[in-house]
């Protein structure tokens, strides 16, 4: 069996692509390795194209196998379940750089499957999946205008590193995944800690140099093992139909683009199609195909208006941002809320504060179980675009958009020491016409300020677009949905006035030059600063006080050995405090106790109960105690967990008793007064001198 392996070195570790001895029934399959991490990627194509579609039916599935890490899945079911959020995000990162590189008119189903087969504690397998997908397609007979490659770039101590180790990633202030062809960058995804745009650009270009090396590996692999590509037939009928639509509809579509309202504009454009369809007497079975051709003409009109007349769909200039309307503190019961409206895009964003126990427990194969204290959930209901569709489960798109917005805000979220709350941000998109994820970033920052989360700065986001011809390009600020759909780029940039915190770029052309990237980043910074000015006008700083409906946090410091006393046997004591007060309690082995309560009264009651548990016994004070043992000479009374006292027979009654057993028994609860504490801490109590109207200091223990 033939085994072909092409090797190089990346970040000091061996890096290879191999094929020839596995998954041979797939159209193309490779294994990509870095160090001891290995990812298998297989590409399969259907025999026939799908009918009546105008998009590529591409599916990417990425799965991290437990066996790759030498582990068995936890829980009752001992096999991998549905894809995790991380696996979905990695699959999207594999999909996005390869999708623009399939030829127009290719409508066969393509399935890309990536499995992590082996994983060390050094190198993340996700970027190997990008290279593997490209290599599998490149050596296959599937039409593909690649190859491309993907790398991760981090900056540690001012130095860029390609495909860093996990340890290097943890120290970085910038982390981006860059994918590109030999000539240009095609995809970027990542985050940073307020890093300037110039550094982001240099990181992209640094990664592109390494990408070229990985593309050479793929070219060498194809030269040794590549299959002949299938040909996509030219549709002459489609070409003729497009010319007819241009002749009859171009000018009228151009006039329709003067309508700023999205619904009215689309209604007019659709009416033009219906009229010309009748004029051309297009048969019913070819109407769908004709509608796809008409869409191309609509796209051409929009692009020509921008490129040659500097006119956008809604009449704005290329760098102009839509009107913005902001409202904070929208509803009284939310801990924080904001509505951020930009043109016909609107996000209602809320913030809810909770205790550490309410954080998101995340289980990853590599890191195990971790607790996430800041989370952002993005929801995109069908009504936001006026569609009459039933609600759907959370989509991959919603997960991806939420992750992008979360990454934008996270660098400004205060540490747990500064702000001991779990923070959940929810963005419900109420209207959509482009850039909802960036509206979520803006609305999220406003809602966090409204909630009183002590963020040092606002974060804003903007989506940039691109219209490009062979000899000209125009960068668009704050793109509409149609500009995203019909344009060549969707470049989202979020950050503060001081730098970028999150970035995501997808393109539909074969790559972007340094000039275009630089122009887009500079124009994004100008737009972001304009939006930030409006946000600071709406709410210039975080509120000084939390919502009265937010949980209060009280912190106590106790001796570490007292933690077990607070918990009690089988959790008896802490359960009782929680049941009686409704609070949530977070205990740290260092002796830090955090009490989360819905009211000040509940917090004070919980503190009092904890103090009763851990207090020192004081001479002359009155306590309740349970009899644990009885002898003739007296009874042993437990005042608090682990605190025993002696009730001598002479201190039980003013009358002389022969034996304590005549009066008390095990299990009796007595109200006693501390009469003596000796040098060794031994406690003696009395029943004789107890005032009737004095409450026991530890009464809650016996209620």
UniProtKB/Swiss-Prot annotation:
Pfam families: KH_1 (PF00013), PNPase (PF03726), RNase_PH (PF01138), RNase_PH_C (PF03725), S1 (PF00575). Keywords: Cytoplasm, Magnesium, Metal-binding, Nucleotidyltransferase, RNA-binding, Transferase. It is found in: Cytoplasm. GO terms for molecular function: 3'-5'-RNA exonuclease activity; magnesium ion binding; polyribonucleotide nucleotidyltransferase activity; RNA binding. One of its GO terms (biological process) is mRNA catabolic process. Residues 551-610 form the KH domain. Residues 620-688 form the S1 motif domain. It comes from the Bacteria. Mg(2+) binds at residues 484, 490. Its EC number is 2.7.7.8. GO terms for cellular component: cytosol. The keyword Nucleotidyltransferase applies. Its cofactor is Mg(2+). The keyword Cell inner membrane does not apply. SUPFAM superfamilies: Eukaryotic type KH-domain (KH-domain type I) (SSF54791), Nucleic acid-binding proteins (SSF50249), Polynucleotide phosphorylase/guanosine pentaphosphate synthase (PNPase/GPSI), domain 3 (SSF46915), Ribonuclease PH domain 2-like (SSF55666), Ribosomal protein S5 domain 2-like (SSF54211). It catalyses: RNA(n+1) + phosphate = RNA(n) + a ribonucleoside 5'-diphosphate. Involved in mRNA degradation. Catalyzes the phosphorolysis of single-stranded polyribonucleotides processively in the 3'- to 5'-direction. Belongs to the polyribonucleotide nucleotidyltransferase family. This is Polyribonucleotide nucleotidyltransferase. It comes from Sulfurihydrogenibium sp. (strain YO3AOP1). The gene is pnp.
């Amino acid at each position: 069996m033939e085994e072909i392996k092409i090797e190089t070195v990346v970040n000091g570790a061996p890096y290879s692509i191999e094929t020839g001895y596995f998954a041979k029934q797939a159209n193309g399959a490779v294994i990509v390795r870095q160090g001891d991490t290995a990812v298998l990627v297989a590409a399969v194509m259907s025999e026939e194209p799908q009918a009546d579609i105008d998009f590529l039916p591409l599916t990417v599935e990425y799965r991290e196998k437990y066996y790759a890490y030498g582990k068995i899945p936890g829980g009752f079911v001992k096999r991998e379940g549905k894809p995790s959020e991380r696996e979905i995000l990695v699959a999207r990162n594999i999909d996005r750089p390869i999708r623009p590189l399939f030829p127009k008119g290719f409508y066969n189903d393509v399935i890309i499957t990536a499995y992590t087969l082996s994983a060390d504690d050094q190198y993340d397998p996700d970027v190997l999946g990008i290279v593997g997908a490209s290599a599998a397609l490149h050596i296959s007979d599937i039409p593909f205008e690649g190859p491309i490659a993907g790398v991760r770039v981090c900056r540690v101590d001012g130095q860029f590193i390609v495909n860093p180790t996990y340890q290097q990633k943890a120290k970085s202030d910038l982390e981006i995944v860059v994918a590109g062809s030999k000539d240009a960058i095609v995809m970027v995804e990542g985050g940073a800690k307020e890093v300037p745009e110039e550094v982001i650009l240099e990181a992209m270009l640094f990664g592109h140099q390494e990408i070229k090396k990985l593309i050479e590996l793929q070219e060498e692999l194809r030269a040794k093992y590549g299959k002949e590509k299938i040909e996509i037939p030219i549709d002459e009928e489609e070409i003729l139909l497009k010319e007819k639509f241009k002749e009859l509809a171009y000018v009228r579509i151009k006039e329709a683009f003067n309508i700023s309202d999205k619904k009215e504009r689309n209604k007019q454009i659709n009416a033009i199609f219906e009229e010309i369809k009748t004029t051309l007497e297009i048969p019913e079975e070819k109407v769908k195909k004709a509608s796809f051709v008409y869409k191309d003409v609509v796209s051409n009109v929009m692009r020509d208006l921008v490129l040659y007349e500097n006119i956008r769909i809604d009449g704005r200039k290329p760098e102009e941002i839509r009107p913005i309307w902001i409202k904070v503190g929208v509803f009284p019961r939310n801990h924080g809320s904001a509505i951020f409206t930009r043109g016909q895009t609107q996000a209602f964003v809320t913030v809810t504060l909770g205790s550490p126990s309410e954080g998101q427990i995340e289980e990853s194969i590599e890191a195990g179980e971790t607790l996430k204290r800041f989370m952002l959930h993005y929801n995109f209901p069908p009504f936001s675009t006026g569609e009459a569709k039933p609600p759907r489960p959370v989509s991959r798109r919603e997960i991806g958009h939420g992750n992008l917005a979360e990454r934008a805000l996270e660098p400004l979220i205060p540490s747990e020491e500064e702000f001991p709350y779990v923070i959940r941000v929810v963005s419900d998109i109420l209207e959509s016409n482009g850039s909802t994820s960036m509206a979520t970033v803006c609305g999220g920052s406003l809602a966090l300020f409204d909630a009183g989360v002590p963020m040092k700065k606002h974060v804003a986001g903007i989506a940039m677009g691109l219209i490009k011809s062979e000899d000209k390009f125009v960068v668009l600020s704050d793109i509409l949905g149609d500009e995203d759909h019909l344009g060549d780029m969707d470049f989202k940039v979020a950050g503060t006035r001081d730098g970028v915190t999150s970035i995501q770029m997808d393109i539909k052309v074969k790559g972007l030059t340094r000039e275009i990237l630089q122009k887009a980043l500079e124009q994004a910074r100008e737009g972001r600063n304009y939006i930030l000015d409006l946000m600071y006008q709406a709410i210039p700083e975080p509120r000084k006080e939390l919502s009265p409906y937010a949980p209060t946090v009280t912190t106590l410091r106790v001796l570490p050995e007292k933690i077990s006393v607070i918990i009690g046997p089988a959790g008896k004591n802490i359960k009782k405090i929680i049941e009686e007060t409704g609070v949530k309690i977070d205990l740290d082995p260092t002796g830090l106790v955090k009490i989360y309560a819905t009211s000040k009264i509940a917090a004070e009651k919980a503190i009092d109960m904890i103090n009763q548990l851990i207090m020192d016994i004081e001479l002359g004070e009155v306590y309740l105690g349970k009899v644990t043992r009885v002898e003739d000479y007296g009874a042993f009374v437990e005042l608090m967990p682990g605190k025993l006292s002696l009730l001598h027979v002479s201190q039980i009654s003013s009358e002389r008793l022969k034996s304590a057993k005549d009066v008390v028994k095990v299990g009796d609860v007595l109200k006693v007064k501390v009469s003596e504490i000796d040098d060794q801490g031994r406690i003696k109590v009395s029943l004789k001198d107890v005032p009737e109207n004095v409450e026991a200091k530890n009464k809650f223990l016996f209620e």
